[in-house]
UniProtKB/Swiss-Prot annotation:
Annotated GO biological process: cytokine-mediated signaling pathway; heart morphogenesis; heart trabecula formation; muscle contraction; regulation of ryanodine-sensitive calcium-release channel activity; release of sequestered calcium ion into cytosol; response to caffeine; T cell proliferation
Location(s), subcellular: Cytoplasm, Cytosol; Sarcoplasmic reticulum membrane
Originating species: Mus musculus (Mouse)
Cited PANTHER family: PEPTIDYL-PROLYL CIS-TRANS ISOMERASE, PEPTIDYL-PROLYL CIS-TRANS ISOMERASE FKBP1A-RELATED
Keyword Acetylation: yes
Name under which the protein is recorded: Peptidyl-prolyl cis-trans isomerase FKBP1A
Subunit structure: Interacts with TGFBR1; prevents TGFBR1 phosphorylation by TGFBR2 and stabilizes it in the inactive conformation. Interacts with ACVR1B and SMAD7. Identified in a complex composed of RYR1, PDE4D, PKA, FKBP1A and protein phosphatase 1 (PP1). Interacts directly with RYR2 and RYR3. Interacts directly with RYR1. Interacts with GLMN; rapamycin and FK506 abolish the interaction with GLMN in a dose dependent manner.
Gene for this chain: Fkbp1a
């Protein structure tokens, strides 16, 4: 499957991230059953990553690249675009499909 992007609320429709830019996002990560495992919103601190530097899972690289600034979307990411057969011990089980609620706040 890879990554599926479902818009929750639209962005500006013009400003999309490019490789090398820093994406500033708020997110909540959940397992398919809705169990939350991480959230920048709970910490009240946006998360930053550089697109194209493999600092995040492949599903984020490809999913966030399709979002415009201000957009909030649900990213449904298959395990091969996330943590695969290994998972993340104690947090994400092996072969888990992940669901992220991501808002692209700005680009730097």
């Amino acid at each position: 499957m890879g990554v599926q992007v479902e818009t929750i609320s639209p962005g500006d429709g013009r400003t999309f991230p490019k490789r090398g830019q820093t994406c500033v996002v708020h997110y909540t990560g959940m397992l398919e059953d809705g169990k939350k495992f991480d959230s920048s919103r709970d910490r009240n601190k946006p998360f930053k990553f550089t697109l194209g530097k493999q600092e995040v899972i492949r599903g984020w690289e490809e999913g966030v690249a399709q979002m415009s600034v201000g957009q909030r979307a649900k990213l449904i990411i298959s395990s091969d675009y996330a943590y695969g057969a290994t998972g993340h011990p104690g947090i994400i089980p092996p072969h888990a499909t992940l669901v992220f609620d991501v808002e692209l706040l700005k680009l730097e």
